[in-house]
Curated annotation (Swiss-Prot):
GO molecular-function terms, A-Z: quinone binding
Organism name: Rhodopseudomonas palustris (strain ATCC BAA-98 / CGA009)
Sequence similarity: Belongs to the PqqD family.
GO biological process assignments: pyrroloquinoline quinone biosynthetic process
Gene that encodes the chain: pqqD
Protein's UniProt keywords contain Ubl conjugation: no
Domain of life: Bacteria
UniProt xrefs under InterPro entries: PQQD, PqqD_bac, PqqD_sf
Protein name: PqqA binding protein
Keywords: PQQ biosynthesis
Coiled coil segments of this chain: none
Summary of subunit composition and partner proteins: Monomer. Interacts with PqqE.
Pathway entry: Cofactor biosynthesis; pyrroloquinoline quinone biosynthesis
């Protein structure tokens, strides 16, 4: 089954789909997103955001954490985070965590 495409909002809980992994590549000495026949090399800020995309945190919590860490305007951080996450979702590198049955 193909991963569900999402429309990123502050309430969604993004996570990498099963076919993609965020991994530190020792050869390249940088973080990469590995997917079948594709490799993306995100920058440092994108890596920090992706590490927070664990399916437990919603986008609002990710934005709040980054705004607090960098003492930056939440609205500005929010626009950048939402744009990056939506771009990755549109390319199939992000999906939304689903509720698990108890």
């Amino acid at each position: 089954m193909a991963p569900r495409r999402i429309s990123v909002s502050e309430t969604c809980r993004p996570v990498l789909p099963r076919h993609a992994r965020l991994k530190f590549d020792d050869t390249r000495q940088r973080w990469v997103i590995l997917a079948p026949e594709r490799v993306l090399a995100p920058d440092e800020i994108a890596v920090e955001i992706l590490q927070l995309c664990d399916g437990a945190c919603d986008v609002a919590a990710i934005i709040d954490a980054l705004a607090a860490k960098y003492t930056a305007d939440r609205a500005e951080i929010g626009r950048d985070v939402m744009a990056m996450l939506q771009d990755l979702a549109d390319k199939g590198f992000l999906t939304e965590a689903r509720e698990t049955a108890p």
